[in-house]
From Swiss-Prot:
The chain crosses the membrane at residues 73-93. One of its GO terms (cellular component) is mitochondrial membrane. PANTHER family: ATP SYNTHASE 9 MITOCHONDRIAL-RELATED, TRANSMEMBRANE PROTEIN. InterPro entries: Mt_uS3-like. Keywords: Membrane, Mitochondrion, Transmembrane, Transmembrane helix. The lineage of its organism: Eukaryota, Viridiplantae, Streptophyta, Embryophyta, Tracheophyta. This is Uncharacterized ribosomal S3-like protein AtMg00690, mitochondrial. Belongs to the universal ribosomal protein uS3 family. It is a single-pass membrane protein. It is found in: Mitochondrion membrane.
Length: 240
């Protein structure tokens, strides 16, 4: 009786040991009867074909296509045409408007100047686009070889005092520009809006350049008038 119980317990123990051994072998993926470093056929197929689950999910591609495929490029082109391109119109228009305003600011005469008076009484500064200069009359050595008809007649010379090119008319034009500059300067000091201040600065810049140009031209005309009058006095004194 005792021997039969021992044999039954021994059989159960052998079965338990065998099941435990198989469980350990299944966990370590080692098939009985194979060497320790040798891989199974299943693992070889998985390494060659890839994990079936990952292959179905598309995450185990050995030669994955580039992101810049035809479909991706077409998608980017579609997004650019229908979403990005419509927003570029106002941006380009704004850039062209800024370029136009900036060119208008720097293109009115293309001048770099400083307002002042030189030693000869003329306005100083650098002007790239100068107005046409009136040339002085060409006089001989004795100033007597020239014909009197080459200069304006006496009545026209002295009638010019009350004409549109007279000193009074020139002073009125200069005074109008000077008053405009003073008014713009006063408005600029009290203007809080930055955009209107910039517009006032542009207008003031143009007014100062116009004032300088008129000042230079009028000074040249005054010098020419003085040369004509001095030559006429010499001619009149010669026949007294």
């Amino acid at each position: 009786m005792r021997s039969s119980v021992l044999r039954s317990l021994r059989g159960r123990l052998v079965i338990n040991l065998e099941s435990t051994r198989k469980l350990r072998l299944s966990r370590t993926n080692i098939v009985p009867g194979r060497k320790k470093g040798q891989k199974s056929i299943k693992s070889k197929n998985m390494a060659r074909k890839g994990n079936p689950i990952l292959v179905r999910l598309g995450k185990n591609r050995s030669s994955d296509s580039s992101w810049f495929s035809a479909e991706a490029l077409l998608g980017c082109l579609y997004f650019f045409i229908y979403f990005v391109a419509p927003t570029l119109g106002p941006v380009l228009f704004l850039l062209r408007l800024i370029h136009f305003v900036w060119g208008l600011r720097l293109g009115l005469g293309n001048e770099n100047f400083h307002f002042g008076v030189g030693p000869d009484g003329g306005a100083t500064g650098l002007d790239l686009n100068q107005p046409p200069q009136e040339q002085q009359p060409t006089l001989g050595v004795n100033r007597a070889a020239l014909d009197l008809n080459e200069l304006p007649p006496v009545h026209l010379l002295y009638a010019e005092v009350e004409g549109p090119q007279s000193t009074k008319a020139q002073n009125d034009v200069m005074l109008a520009h000077l008053n405009q500059v003073q008014n713009l300067t006063r408005d600029l000091q009290t203007e809080p809006n930055i955009w209107r201040r910039q517009a006032l600065i542009d207008i003031l810049d143009w007014e100062v350049r116009s004032l300088q140009r008129h000042f230079r031209i009028f000074r040249q005309r005054d010098r020419l008038r003085e040369v004509q009058r001095s030559w006429l006095r010499e001619q009149l004194n010669r026949y007294r």
